[in-house]
């Protein structure tokens, strides 16, 4: 008897356009002229450089160490010379620059000394977690949360189910589909490694029904220890909370994490990266990227991290046109960028070239309620929009802004052509900056009070000595 499936609220059935790329074998992208490696390609604290300008580095060598627990190292994705350490354009909705390490490839692609780990089943989960951390592995299907943090949470809590997420629901994107078709053994082995690392009772690999070839590739290798499920196509079913609801019927409470209900989820790409890290000693230095849209030869590429976006587009016959838009990610959740020299990073799953977008001007909200109907997080997007525009952060918290998964369903159905998700992202950034500033001020005050108390104590001790 098959697993009972459940429906998640809201969502959309929209054209997927995956046929542009999913049937073509992936290509290995040739070396670019420069590799640009941001120090922060993940949620958490940026890594700190351990090299200097002029140093020679090899492929797989650590060039920036993790700083703190929620952080991962950055590795050279090819051999060459460090030509700069400075601020460069990085994938960001607001066009910001961030610290990066720039490598001038020498063309030799020489590996650093890397060491595979012994049979994963013979080592303890904590050691396996550390191997995955040192490999710089983060979630490859979402915001880039450091994988070892999720794994550690798993060993500190009882994990009933590990979900390996292959539900690639965003239109145009087929990089996970190609990865599974071409390297199914990586997915299966990686899933078993992660299961061992979190000591999960059950393991499920979930795909969507428009991935029959990927399903068949996994089915040939799978045993009874892993359950393989194909789900009806619906957007955004690949969202963490939505997929948990569909597979288990459970809901992750607002402000809570999947681990709080006994579930850990990782992307298929993360599973494959774990396999390579453990069995080969290879850090995360490349990934599959879909390059699609208005291109002569759209397809999936295997790309070294740090490769400029323009270099990827060029492999697919890109020719710059007036009025076009470049999106990193898909059309629903992706970010519009103007600088094609920014690099592919650990979380880059797609480069999408589109004709002129947002041809119709934004109009006032008519409070039609369509956005409410399609919101998979059961929020009130029109209220979030109103309070985001007025920067009413207190009301945004009341309306659970941070439960928004930025899926873009609300923007898609909005008859007023309002880029709702853009407003939500901006508000989230402002709130986090405000909270960071408040923490800094509180820390400064604590230091001032402590220093004042110390000086007063020392002055009192000096007076006491004089009196004695």
Positions of predicted regions on the chain:
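Gly-rich Lys/Arg/Thr-decorated short loops/hinges at beta-loop-alpha junctions or inter-strand turns
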Residues: 109-111, 139, 162-176, 295
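Hydrophobic alpha-helical positions that pack around
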Residues: 199-309, 315-322, 330
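Conserved hydrophobic positions within beta-strands
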Residues: 80-82
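Histidine-anchored nucleotide/phosphate-binding helix
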Residues: 181-196
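Short, well-structured beta-strand-loop connectors
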Residues: 52-65, 84
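N-terminal, Lys/Arg-enriched amphipathic/low-complexity engagement segments
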Residues: 1-50, 102
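Ferredoxin-type iron-sulfur electron-transfer modules in oxidoreductases and energy-metabolism complexes
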Residues: 348-362, 372, 376-455
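Acidic low-complexity segments
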Residues: 84, 89-145, 156, 212
